[in-house]
Amino acid sequence: MFDFHHFRELPLMLNTFRLAIPSPITLEAAGLIALADLHAVTLRTALVGGARFLDVLVLVPGMHKQQCADEINRGEFPTTGAMTSGCVFRVENPATVSYLQSIGQTGHLVTARVSQNPSQNTDISLQNRTLQSLFVAGIPATILYFLCPISTISVVVVLCAIGDWWGVGALGMFVSARVINVVVIKRRSQQGWKGAIETGDGDLLILLSQDRWVRLQGTINDLKTVTAGQWLRDLSAPENFSVTFATMMIYSSAILAFNASTVGSLLIACLLLCSVTLLTLCNSLTRCLQMYDCVVQTKGEPEKYNRRLDMAKKLVLESKRDDWAVGMGLVHPKVGSTRRPVAV
């Protein structure tokens, strides 16, 4: 039998249920997105061989990790053989190793060539040099990259228009932190020791992990530029302090963003998410590595081999010497051979 006592308690039950429903989601913590540990900025730093001043307007999650770009190779320094001289050594540039890892394919020999950046070509006009060097990474990648600072400027204009000064302050701190990191990267990436200047062309075979093989060709000096020496030097004490200060600024600005309006928080969140999407697409569409005044690009199609020995024998025939292959452990030395690889 129905008890009217329960019917009288129905409004109280509904009110309790209404209180149990969570309140509408707020966007006060949108600035915390900037603290996500993403690697779009570090990869971009490696692909262009440093930083550009326009990077200060590229605000993406993980921007406080830019100084970790020298770890982009995941600790790999692959064995390399110079097929023209017989020397065996390692590629010491983490950015170059990262690029070679990205173009390498298991069981395939990928050929890449090092050439001078179009900005160094004095045979063409200054205007053509500027345009070619600007779009050396490819037109789609360049357009996607420029959309990042355009997005930042657009969001700042809107925040100023609606009078959300907390949001403007948060973005201003993001930009200030980026300025510090960009300046430090530019200081660390200045070209240093690359060995003695030599003439002639070089031909390198690089053995990467997971049975990925890359053949890198170009002039000897250009090959040294992208493989030898130190890319990012260690942080000095003032630089270390500056980077720490910039990192704390990013954390502080994420907290400061809590005071932004709902619209401002939404704009900041959309800016960070859209920018990291654009930069990730830009990185994936970038078809070359820029290192100092050189550009590394793939050449032709990858060649598939059933055995690594088959690949080694073919290259030995082309180079007309096997000391580099012996030094890399690709082939056994011939009986009675007096030629020995040179390890450097």
Where are these regions (language model features)?
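Transmembrane helical hairpin unit
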Residues: 228-288
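Soluble extramembrane domains flanking the early transmembrane region of eukaryotic membrane proteins
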Residues: 1-145
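Hydrophobic alpha-helical membrane-embedded segments
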Residues: 158-197, 276-280
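Membrane-lumen (extracellular) interface motif
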Residues: 138-139, 149-174, 248-270
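Cytosolic/matrix-facing juxtamembrane and C-terminal tails of multi-pass cellular membrane proteins
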Residues: 192-237, 277-344
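Cytosolic-side membrane-insertion boundary helix
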Residues: 121-165, 231-238
